[in-house]
Amino acid sequence: MKGIRKSILCLVLSAGVIAPVTTSIVQSPQKCYACTVDKGSYADTFTEFTNVEEAKKWGNAQYKKYGLSKPEQEAIKFYTRDASKINGPLRANQGNENGLPADILQKVKLIDQSFSKMKMPQNIILFRGDDPAYLGPEFQDKILNKDGTINKTVFEQVKAKFLKKDRTEYGYISTSLMSAQFGGRPIVTKFKVTNGSKGGYIDPISYFPGQLEVLLPRNNSYYISDMQISPNNRQIMITAMIFK
C-alpha cells in the first residue's frame, strides 16, 4: 500500500514479559530508570506510515471505534495541552497515585479508564521526540556540542548506560504515527508496539491537532535495542520495543 512501509524487527525482550517543550508529544522524562533485562528472541513485521494522509485515514478509523465518553475526551485534551501537569506529578511519585492533587488524580483515572477502549489493532511503529533531558542530568548538558551536533564521546557513555536495557516511563507516553514531527529534536525514539497493546490515536481530540498523536499508557516499560547517531550527526536515533 502506498505510504506504508513494512519493517522486519529482530530483537530481544525481557523474558518476563517527559516535560514537553511546546506540545505533549515532545517529552523529556527524567523519572525513568534503566536496568538489565533477561533476553528472549522476538521477530515480527511492523507497519510504518510514510504518508500523512494514509496515517490520518488509519488513525481516524481507529478513533471512531473507541467510543470515548465526554469526560474521557476532556481529560485527554487537558493532557495534550500541557502534559507536564499530569506527567510531572506521576514521575515525581514514580507512578504512584498517592499524593496526587485531587484534580490531577481525577484526570489520571479517566485517562487510565480510556485505555480499556483503546488498543493497537496491529503491530505498528510509533515515534517520539525528546530533548537532552531525556538522558538525565548526567548527560543532558554534555550530549550536544556547541554547534548542535552529537558529542560522540558522550554518546558512547550514553550507550553504555541505556543500550540493551529496559526503561520505565511513569508518565503517559505521547507519540506520533510519523517521524517527520520530530525533525528538529536531538533524540528520536522509534517504538515497536505490538498488536493488542494498549494505546490510542487521539489526534481528533488533541489540543494540538495535526500531530498524528498516539497516546500510550503510563507505567510502561520498553527495551532499547539500538542507539545510533543520524548521518547528519544531529540526532540520536533510538529503537525500542514497548512491553505489553
Swiss-Prot record:
Main subcellular location: secreted
Active-site residues per Swiss-Prot or TrEMBL entry: 128, 174, 213
Matches recorded under CDD domains: VIP2
E.C. number(s) listed in UniProt: 2.4.2.-
Signal peptide start and end residues: 1-40
Any GO molecular function: NAD+-protein mono-ADP-ribosyltransferase activity
Reactions catalysed: L-asparaginyl-[protein] + NAD(+) = N(4)-(ADP-D-ribosyl)-L-asparaginyl-[protein] + nicotinamide + H(+)
Residues the entry annotates as binding NAD(+): 80, 87, 91, 128-131, 167-169, 182-185, 211-213
Record-annotated TR mART core domain positions: 44-244
InterPro entries: ADP-ribosyltransferase (IPR003540), Mono-ADP_RibTrfase_C3/Edin (IPR016678)
GO cellular component, one term: extracellular region
Enzyme type, top EC level: transferase
Keyword list, A-Z: Glycosyltransferase, NAD, Nucleotidyltransferase, Secreted, Signal, Transferase
Function: ADP-ribosylates eukaryotic Rho and Rac proteins on an asparagine residue.
Subunit structure: Monomer.
Protein's name according to its UniProt entry: Mono-ADP-ribosyltransferase C3
Naturally occurring in which organism (per UniProt): Clostridium botulinum C phage (Clostridium botulinum C bacteriophage)
